[in-house]
């Protein structure tokens, strides 16, 4: 009976731990006005907010911008922790974008202070009025635990406020304010953790004013509640009894007063709790926490498995904008041929212009393509989760009957092959531009293989899938045949080979095996094409043998006459050492044995560290020899007369839809 009474006394504490898992985000939709779905303001909102993740993470944790004119003009900003991992920042901004679009679906103003997976805080905000650089302390929002805190509140809040002020001072300390702070302190038997964050476009003084206002408002309205957070448009504050953001260093606050004695913890009747009772409470509480954690873990695993099963193939949960098909038709002038930019194995690409003047690239999947639906779903689900300056950005999609549309950011300079393989235009690609393209593509592939939340094998790297922005910066595109690897997965095998001839490694063509090293091989071929200025397939009969670009370069390398490779269109204005080093790296990438090929991380080091000694390249894949018998697989790959070679593939680099390996 006594034990049951003690358990009764523990229920408020037990409820506290239950409630403590609830704080993760807070979205506030403005009441200043509404807009109609798919009008100019709605389009501007999606276009600007969908680009926040990449821009905020690429600019050190803060970015603001506006888009549109007159009443359709929209202002937006994003805030992360300065100096934090770009991938965490990007993921948090992306999740906030998805939430605010869903909850504030037609409000002209909204903000979201949130955390990604309870591990990383960030903020996004948009409005139809300019708020850049303005201190805005209202409206004030709060969230707190409903359980009463059983402590001496006067003594507790004296030290709690000292901790908060110390954290605020850390956030605005000169000479380089961080605009965020984190601290911890011991108050009685409790360890308290605190965190603050300000929008970086306000001054340090205004940051302090905003946070102090939050502290005062919280004390007035949430006194006696253990844990909580409060925020206004310009700043955010959170405190709790556990280390809620695991990656942040919580410094012991220098302003926290030294304790003169223990804070008296009161029982329900107002008396002191004895040592024996404290021990009993501690044991019982430990038991409840253990049970809670076990149950919580089991339930979370079950819920996560169900959610993954339910959403794995649902593109509506991808976070991308679903455009109205009629808006796409209007933007492309009903897919008029004059707006056509090109075509691929699964459809055509058109230029589109929205009413606000925003230009986009619209990929219309072929209705008769056997793999079109799979390609479409794969591209939406993968690319929506990727954010990098060297990857083309997916703005959204549209589904209308048999029509399947992908909407991308528009690249005014089209693709690399548009310049590289045209005898007139390739003169515009000097060596510095080509070298920057090589380095940019390296960064993009490295992100796919190593630095993103997913491990992505592209499987179709080629000049036609490298788009160029207005400054000729490269962006990798076309993820229709890409595959996502598990964390512990290094390779996979497929019975259907997809990709482009001339770029596919021998183990993939012959056996359907692909891995990160498959992309490395394709990248090696791409480097050679950039240097030579010709397609890999343009090198045929060489000294009585069937050849390709890899064969040709290997022979010149062995003869030490590799500078004959250099595209004459570049003239003499190129760095010979850089060119030779790039040729050397490319030959390392196209080695026959995948284990001999470097990783993209190593390739990046080879390109950026000229003092790094490069190993001697071994025999590359696809060193062709004359063979009298026809190759049946090659006949299936490329219609027409069969091509004789030592591996089952065509020397043409035409794109293919699929090949069934038997």
UniProtKB/Swiss-Prot annotation:
Q: Which cysteines are joined by disulfide bonds?
A: none
Residues in Gnk2-homologous domain copies: 27-131, 137-244
- Report the principal subcellular site: membrane
Could you tell me what reaction this enzyme catalyses? L-seryl-[protein] + ATP = O-phospho-L-seryl-[protein] + ADP + H(+); L-threonyl-[protein] + ATP = O-phospho-L-threonyl-[protein] + ADP + H(+)
Q: Which InterPro entries match?
A: GNK2 (IPR002902), GNK2_sf (IPR038408), Kinase-like_dom_sf (IPR011009), Prot_kinase_dom (IPR000719), Protein_kinase_ATP_BS (IPR017441), Ser-Thr/Tyr_kinase_cat_dom (IPR001245), Ser/Thr_kinase_AS (IPR008271)
Q: Which residues cross the membrane?
A: 278-298
Coiled-coil ranges per UniProt: none
* UniProt entry tagged with the keyword ATP-binding: yes
Task: List the PROSITE patterns.
Answer: GNK2, PROTEIN_KINASE_ATP, PROTEIN_KINASE_DOM, PROTEIN_KINASE_ST
Q: Name one GO molecular function term.
A: protein serine/threonine kinase activity
Q: Provide this UniProt record's keywords sorted from A to Z.
A: ATP-binding, Glycoprotein, Kinase, Membrane, Nucleotide-binding, Receptor, Repeat, Serine/threonine-protein kinase, Signal, Transferase, Transmembrane, Transmembrane helix
A Pfam family of the record is PK_Tyr_Ser-Thr
Stretches assigned to the Protein kinase domain: 335-612
Q: Does the keyword Ribosomal protein apply?
A: no
EC numbers = 2.7.11.-
**Which sequence ranges are listed under topological domain Cytoplasmic?**
299-662
Enumerate the residues binding ATP: 341-349, 363
Stretch forming the signal peptide? 1-26
Glycosylation site residues: 55, 64, 106, 128, 145, 152, 206
Location of the protein in the cell: Membrane
Extracellular topological segments? 27-277
A cellular component annotation (GO) from this entry: membrane
Q: Which Gene3D superfamilies does the annotation name?
A: Gnk2 domain, C-X8-C-X2-C motif, Phosphorylase Kinase, domain 1, Transferase(Phosphotransferase) domain 1
Regarding the membrane, this protein is recorded as:
Single-pass membrane protein
- Similarity section: Belongs to the protein kinase superfamily. Ser/Thr protein kinase family. CRK subfamily.
Query: What is the name listed in the Swiss-Prot or TrEMBL entry for this protein?
Result: Putative cysteine-rich receptor-like protein kinase 16
UniProt gene name: CRK16
């Amino acid at each position: 009976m006594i034990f049951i009474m003690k358990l009764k006394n523990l229920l408020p504490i037990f409820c506290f731990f239950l409630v403590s898992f609830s704080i993760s985000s807070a979205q506030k939709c403005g009441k200043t006005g509404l807009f109609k779905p798919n009008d100019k303001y709605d389009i501007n909102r999606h276009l600007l907010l969908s680009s926040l993740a990449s821009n905020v993470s690429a600019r050190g944790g803060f970015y603001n911008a506006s888009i549109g004119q007159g009443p359709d003009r929209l202002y937006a900003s994003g805030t992360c922790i300065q100096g934090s991992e770009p991938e965490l920042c990007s993921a948090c901004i992306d999740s906030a974008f998805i939430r605010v679009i869903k909850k504030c679906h037609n409000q002209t103003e909204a903000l979201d202070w949130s955390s990604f997976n309870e591990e990383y805080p960030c903020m996004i905000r948009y409005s139809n009025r300019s708020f850049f650089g303005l201190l805005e302390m209202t409206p004030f929002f709060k969230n707190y635990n409903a359980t009463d805190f059983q402590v001496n509140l006067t003594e507790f809040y004296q030290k709690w406020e000292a901790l908060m002020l110390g954290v605020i001072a850390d956030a605005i300390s000169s000479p380089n304010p961080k605009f965020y702070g984190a601290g911890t302190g011991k108050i009685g038997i409790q360890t308290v953790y605190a965190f603050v964050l300000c929008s970086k476009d306000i001054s340090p003084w205004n940051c302090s004013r905003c946070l102090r206002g939050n502290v005062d408002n919280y004390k007035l309205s949430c006194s006696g509640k253990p844990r909580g957070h409060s925020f206004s448009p310009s700043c955010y504050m959170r405190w709790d009894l556990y280390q809620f953001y695991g990656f942040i260093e919580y410094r012991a606050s220098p302003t926290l007063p030294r304790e003169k004695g223990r804070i008296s913890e009161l029982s329900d009747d107002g008396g002191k709790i004895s040592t024996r009772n404290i021990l009993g409470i501690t044991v019982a509480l430990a038991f409840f926490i253990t049970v809670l954690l076990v149950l919580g873990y089991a339930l979370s695993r079950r819920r996560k498995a169900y959610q993954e099963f339910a959403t794995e193939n649902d593109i509506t949960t991808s976070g991308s904008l679903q455009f109205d098909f009629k808006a796409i038709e209007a933007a492309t002038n009903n897919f008029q041929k004059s707006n056509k930019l090109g075509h691929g194995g699964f459809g055509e690409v058109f230029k589109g212009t929205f009413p606000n003047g925003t230009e986009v690239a619209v990929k219309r999947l072929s209705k008769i393509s056997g793999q079109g639906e799979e390609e479409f779903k794969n591209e939406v689900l993968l690319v929506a989760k990727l954010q990098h300056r060297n990857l083309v950005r997916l703005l959204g999609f549209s589904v209308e009957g048999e029509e399947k549309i992908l909407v991308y950011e528009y690249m005014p300079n089209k693709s690399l092959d548009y310049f590289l393989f045209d005898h007139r235009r390739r003169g515009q690609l000097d060596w510095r531009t080509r070298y920057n393209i090589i380095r940019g593509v390296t960064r993009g592939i490295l992100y796919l293989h190593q630095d993103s939340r997913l491990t992505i094998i592209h499987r179709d790297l080629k000049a036609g899938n490298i788009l160029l922005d207005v400054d000729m910066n490269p962006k990798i595109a076309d993820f229709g045949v890409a595959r996502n690897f598990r964390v512990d997965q290094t390779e996979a095998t497929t019975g259907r080979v997809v990709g482009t001839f001339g770029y596919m490694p021998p183990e993939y063509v012959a056996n359907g095996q692909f891995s990160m090293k498959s992309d490395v091989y394709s990248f090696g071929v791409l480097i050679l094409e950039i240097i030579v200025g010709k397609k890999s397939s343009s090198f045929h009969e060489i000294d009585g043998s069937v050849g390709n670009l890899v064969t040709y370069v290997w022979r010149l390398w062995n003869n030490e006459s590799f500078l004959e490779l250099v595209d004459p269109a570049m003239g003499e204005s190129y760095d010979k050492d850089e060119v030779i080093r790039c040729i050397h790296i490319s030959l390392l990438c196209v080695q026959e044995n995948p284990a001999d090929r470097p990783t993209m991380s190593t390739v990046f080091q080879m390109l950026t560290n000229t003092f790094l000694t490069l190993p001697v390249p071994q025999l590359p894949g696809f060193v062709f020899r004359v063979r009298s018998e026809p190759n049946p697989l090659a006949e299936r790959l490329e219609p027409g007369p069969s091509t004789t070679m030592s591996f089952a593939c065509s020397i043409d680099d035409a794109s293919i839809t699929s090949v069934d390996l038997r």
